Every structure is written in structure tokens, then in C-alpha cells.
């Protein structure tokens, strides 16, 4: 009997079981040992197959697909270092909650630790970073199909957050054989093959669904107090809902760039440096934080130093999310669900002077950046470039801080990022996944080092199903380090690492459109034309290296000098 045929039957059952748990997208890298999985994915009509030659980028492509679709996404790679390349995306998913299923083909046990080619110790390779790990045995008809499908159903039922690593050893041969062999093994599942449900319907009830643990019995008391709302990373609808909720309570809402709240008090990273604003916020009796991954340095400093009577943090993600370790309440619950259970009561705003400081800071930004074509000016005016019914992907490092500090995005406009571990690896690949999941017009904005780090992901952007603009802010290096007290003599060589490149040839190599505007009107016109003509265009904005960091520091100093407002 043929080992290759049974490998494929085993893999076909594995992939079909995953589709019963909502897996629609699967990302595949080339490899021989993964042949059973690849052929099974290609033959399954329920799966949309995405391919990429770089496993690190492939993992981030899956991450982006999972972010935007909110569905579990599977990945297939061959054995060896291909598996290790999935580590960065797996780590990010563990911190931000996207569900990834990593199917890593492996050599059979007898080929491990004996000098066999492309054979490494893959079991436990990812340490504690996966939420769950399953080490499957080598496929054999001695193991029932019921065992395999039940094992997968149980693991998928438990996967509420993060990654599932399924290690899949396959023995050779991997090709050929009589496809009719071992039909009885598959047929033992009966009409399950014609069904659409899991074999084992294991239900894991989140606590918030079967008992009112998320309900705060004293909410009706605290909603009458002076409160402050901090909005971190959350979904678009949650952001809209939170904005209306805080406004009804009369509580100031300090929104992160990823909060999708519309940042009703914009330029918070600036006005939070004002002493009087800090004095006002110190009067808060309760602080409610929704979502995590705060970007603003000044907001993080205030969040760390604040001492309200109560500090509540609401997020659907498990675990500790407060680096300041406040005494208070950690409520694991979706933001929208929590808001529905804790209705607001219309009250008079208690901290109206904060709006004055915010307006003054925004006016200072407009005055300072007037007539400039700079990194800071692009961040400030970014909302003007957004496509209708589209989405935004923001990179890490300096650009996301400038957008957070100087810009104001529309309430409820979808914004995506990799702000869990906040690495610059895989940003273009993640943006490609976000675009593919939604088929919406997409603006992605990253720095030059981020673009270089994931340059071969431009191959993924050739296949955009809707207009896409990759906006590369080329400040010649990692200029985030110009914001930090790095030693000046070593800053350029060891921190910023300028590369003195432009991206025109990269765009040509991958058959992408390209433009390099020299003014804001040119940039705006190029972007708007991209939304009309479709495809992917790389637009490069070349700016003076340290100007963005210097402008932010200058504005922070200027805003601290704004005259105090009488309470």
C-alpha cells in the first residue's frame, strides 16, 4: 500500500476539519515535505489559497488576513528553517489575538537528530508563544480517522486567541500512488464529508457569556463620578460606540491612533505635556481604559502616573495589559459588549478646559506645518488621503507616533497595525493580507527601513483586488532614534543606519506603479488618481532625515507654553 496516498488522505481530512471551524484562507510556501498538505489545500473548494516564496512574509500575510477577516487563517510550510521563519508573525498574533493555524510539515521521528537533511527539532520550537500546540503522529491507517478529526476539533474549539501550532510529520514517498487506496479509512466518517459541521462539537463558553462576571455591580455609582476614558486598540464599531458613550457621560476621551474613535481630543501627545492639563486630569476619580497598545509617550507617562480611586481596564484579550500595574479591575470582555451592559447617563462635561488645550495644540500644529511638505505634515493631513469605504494600515516606529500626535482620523475608519510586539518586520506582508481579506481600497504607510526589511513582499502587492497605495516615508534611516537620547556620535552608524536608497527600481522590479511627489498638492493628486485607476502604486516621499522628530519635539515644547485656561 502507498505511503504517499495515505499521507494525502490524512492531510485532506486535516484540512477539511479546519474548514468546519471557519478557516477560509490558507497561505502556502513552496516545499516538498509539505506536499500532502499543499495538494489537500489545492483540492479543497472551501479554501482560498495564497502563496508566497518567503515564509516570514507568508506568516505576516496570514496575520493580515486574520486581522481584517477576524477569522482563523491557516499556514502551510515545509520542514526545517522554514518553520522558524513563522516565529515573528506567531509572536505578534499571540499579543494581538489573531487566530493562526500553523501547519508545519516535518520529517518522521527516525530522521530527527541523525544528520538527515532539512530535519530540525520542530516540536516545541515556538516555546510558550503558541496558545496551543498539537504534535501529530506519523500518518498511519492504524490510527482512526475519528481520532484525527476529534483531535483537531478539540484544539480549534479551544483556540479563542493567538496561534495553534500543528506539527505534521510525513514519511516518504510523497508523490504518486493509486488514489483509490485507503478509501475505507476516509469513508469511516460516513456522511460527515457531506456535512458542514465539526465531528466533535466541543463548546468553550467564555465567562462573559454564561455568567455576568463582566457586569460591575457598582457601575451606577461610578458613572456619576469624574471619569477619564483611555481608548487603545479596538475595532471600528467599538470605537464609534465608545465615543458616543463617553460623550454622554461628559467624560474626556483620550484616543489612540488605533482606537478608531475619531480622537475627539486630538493632539493628545502634545497637550498632555501641559501642566494645567495634567492638573485637570488628576481630578479624575475613575479611569477606564478600553483596549491596549497605547502609542503616545505622553499618554503612557500620564497613564503610569495617574492615581484615581478606581482604574478599570476592559479588553477581550486575556492576560495582563497594564505595564503600570494599577490597583483596580481587569475585565476580560469585548468592548462593545461591556458598553452595552454599562449604559451611560447624560451628565455635564467636567473637564471642558481639555478641549481648549486640544484645540490650541491643533492650531499650533497647523501654524507650524503650514506650507511644509514634510513627514510631520503628511502625518497631520493623512486623513485627506484616505479612500472612501477603505482602510488604513500604519507602520511602526516614527510614522505611527507622528500620526498619533499630529493627525486626526475619521471615527469608525478601519485602522490596522502590528502594535503587539511593534516590530518593523513583515509590515508590507501584513498590509497585503489586510487588503486581500476585505478587497477594500487600502492605504498603507511605512518608513523606508520597514519597506526595505520586507521588500520582497512587494510581490504580494501585485495581486491587489482593489486599489492600493503603499506610501513610503523615506527619511533615510530609523529616525525614531532621533527622538531618544541616543549618543549623538554613534546615532547615525549604530541606530539610524541610513541606507541612501530610493524605491523606484523596487517598484519597477515588481511591476508596481511608482511616483515621487515633491509637494503636498502633488501627493494628494497622485493618491487620488490611484483610487480611480486601481492596482498598487508605491509612492515615495523623501524628507529630511531628522525633521519629523525635531518637529514633534518642538511642538511639545510650544504647547507647554499655551496660556492656562481658567477652570
From Swiss-Prot:
The entry sums up its family as follows: Belongs to the TPP enzyme family. MenD subfamily.
Q: So which cofactors does this thing need? A: Mg(2+); Mn(2+); thiamine diphosphate
List, in alphabetical order, the GO biological process terms annotated in this UniProt record: menaquinone biosynthetic process
* Record key words, sorted: Magnesium, Manganese, Menaquinone biosynthesis, Metal-binding, Thiamine pyrophosphate, Transferase
The record's section on HAMAP family has:
MenD
PANTHER family found in the cross-reference section: 2-SUCCINYL-5-ENOLPYRUVYL-6-HYDROXY-3-CYCLOHEXENE-1-CARBOXYLATE SYNTHASE, PROTEIN PHYLLO, CHLOROPLASTIC
The record lists the catalysed reaction(s) as: isochorismate + 2-oxoglutarate + H(+) = 5-enolpyruvoyl-6-hydroxy-2-succinyl-cyclohex-3-ene-1-carboxylate + CO2
The metabolic or biological pathway listed in the UniProt record of this protein is: Quinol/quinone metabolism; 1,4-dihydroxy-2-naphthoate biosynthesis; 1,4-dihydroxy-2-naphthoate from chorismate: step 2/7; Quinol/quinone metabolism; menaquinone biosynthesis
Task: Give the note describing cofactor binding and stoichiometry.
Answer: Binds 1 thiamine pyrophosphate per subunit.
Q: How does it assemble?
A: Homodimer.
Name the InterPro entries on file: MenaQ_synth_MenD, MenD_middle, THDP-binding, Thiamin_PyroP_enz_TPP-bd_dom, TPP_enzyme_TPP-bd
Q: Which gene encodes it?
A: menD
Give the protein name, as stated in the record. Answer: 2-succinyl-5-enolpyruvyl-6-hydroxy-3-cyclohexene-1-carboxylate synthase
Q: Which Pfam families match?
A: TPP_enzyme_C, TPP_enzyme_M_2, TPP_enzyme_N
Molecular function (GO) terms for this protein are:
2-succinyl-5-enolpyruvyl-6-hydroxy-3-cyclohexene-1-carboxylic-acid synthase activity; magnesium ion binding; manganese ion binding; thiamine pyrophosphate binding
Q: What does this protein do?
A: Catalyzes the thiamine diphosphate-dependent decarboxylation of 2-oxoglutarate and the subsequent addition of the resulting succinic semialdehyde-thiamine pyrophosphate anion to isochorismate to yield 2-succinyl-5-enolpyruvyl-6-hydroxy-3-cyclohexene-1-carboxylate (SEPHCHC).
Amino acid at each position: 500500500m502507498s505511503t504517499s496516498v495515505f499521507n494525502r488522505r490524512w492531510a485532506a481530512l486535516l484540512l477539511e476539519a479546519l474548514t468546519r471551524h471557519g478557516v477560509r484562507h490558507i497561505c502556502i510556501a513552496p516545499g516538498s515535505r509539505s506536499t500532502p498538505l499543499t495538494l489537500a489545500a489545492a483540492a479543497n473548494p472551501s479554501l482560498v489559497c495564497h502563496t508566497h516564496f518567503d515564509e516570514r512574509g507568508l506568516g505576516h500575510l496570514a496575520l493580515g488576513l486574520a486581522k481584517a477577516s477576524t477569522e482563523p487563517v491557516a499556514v502551510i510550510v515545509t520542514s526545517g528553517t522554514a518553520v522558524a521563519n513563522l516565529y515573528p508573525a506567531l509572536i505578534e498574533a499571540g499579543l494581538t489575538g489573531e487566530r493562526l493555524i500553523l501547519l508545519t510539515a516535518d520529517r518522521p521521528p527516525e530522521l530527527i537528530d541523525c544528520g538527515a537533511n532539512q530535519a530540525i527539532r520542530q516540536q516545541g520550537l515556538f516555546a510558550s508563544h503558541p496558545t496551543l500546540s498539537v504534535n501529530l503522529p506519523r500518518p498511519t491507517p492504524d490510527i482512526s480517522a475519528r481520532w484525527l478529526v476529534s483531535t483537531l476539533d478539540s484544539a480549534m474549539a479551544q483556540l479563542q486567541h493567538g496561534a495553534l501550532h500543528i506539527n505534521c510529520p510525513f514519511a516518504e514517498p510523497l508523490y504518486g500512488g493509486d488514489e483509490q487506496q485507503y478509501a475505507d479509512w476516509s469513508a469511516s466518517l460516513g456522511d460527515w464529508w457531506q456535512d458542514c459541521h465539526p465531528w466533535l462539537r466541543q463548546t468553550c463558553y467564555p465567562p462573559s457569556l454564561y455568567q455576568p462576571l463582566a457586569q460591575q455591580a457598582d457601575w451606577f455609582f461610578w458613572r456619576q463620578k469624574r471619569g477619564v476614558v483611555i481608548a487603545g486598540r479596538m475595532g471600528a464599531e467599538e470605537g464609534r460606540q465608545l465615543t458616543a458613550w463617553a460623550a454622554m457621560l461628559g467624560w474626556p476621551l483620550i484616543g489612540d491612533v488605533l482606537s478608531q474613535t475619531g480622537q475627539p481630543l486630538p493632539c493628545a501627545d502634545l497637550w498632555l505635556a501641559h501642566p494645567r492639563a495634567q492638573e485637570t486630569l488628576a481630578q479624575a476619580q475613575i479611569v477606564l481604559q478600553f483596549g491596549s497598545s497605547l502609542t503616545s509617550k505622553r499618554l503612557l507617562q500620564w497613564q503610569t502616573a495617574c492615581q484615581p480611586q478606581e482604574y478599570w481596564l476592559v479588553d477581550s484579550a486575556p492576560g495582563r495589559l497594564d505595564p503600570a500595574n494599577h490597583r483596580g479591575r481587569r475585565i476580560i470582555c469585548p468592548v462593545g459588549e461591556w458598553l452595552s451592559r454599562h449604559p451611560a447617563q447624560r451628565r455635564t462635561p467636567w473637564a471642558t478646559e481639555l478641549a481648549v488645550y486640544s484645540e490650541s495644540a491643533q492650531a499650533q500644529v497647523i501654524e507650524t506645518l503650514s506650507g511644509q511638505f514634510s513627514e510631520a505634515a503628511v502625518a497631520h493631513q493623512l486623513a485627506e488621503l484616505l479612500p472612501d469605504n477603505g482602510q488604513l494600515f500604519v507602520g511602526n516606529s516614527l510614522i505611527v507616533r507622528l500620526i498619533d500626535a499630529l493627525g486626526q482620523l475619521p471615527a469608525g475608519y478601519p485602522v490596522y497595525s502590528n502594535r503587539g510586539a511593534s516590530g518593523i518586520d513583515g509590515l508590507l506582508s501584513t498590509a497585503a493580507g489586510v487588503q486581500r481579506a476585505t478587497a477594500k481600497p487600502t492605504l498603507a504607510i511605512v518608513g523606508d527601513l520597514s519597506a526595505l526589511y520586507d521588500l520582497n513582499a512587494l510581490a504580494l502587492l501585485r495581486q491587489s483586488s482593489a486599489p492600493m497605495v503603499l506610501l513610503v516615508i523615506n527619511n533615510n534611516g530609523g529616525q525614531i532614534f532621533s527622538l531618544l537620547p541616543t549618543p549623538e556620535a554613534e546615532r547615525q552608524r549604530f541606530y539610524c543606519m541610513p541606507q541612501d536608497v530610493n524605491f523606484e527600481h523596487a517598484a519597477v522590479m515588481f511591476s508596481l506603479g511608482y511616483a515621487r511627489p515633491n509637494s503636498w498638492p502633488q501627493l494628494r493628486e497622485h493618491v487620488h488618481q490611484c483610487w480611480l485607476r486601481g492596482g498598487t502604486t508605491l509612492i515615495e516621499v523623501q524628507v529630511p532625515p531628522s525633521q519629523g522628530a525635531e518637529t514633534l519635539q518642538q511642538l511639545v515644547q510650544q504647547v507647554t507654553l499655551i496660556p492656562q485656561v481658567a477652570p
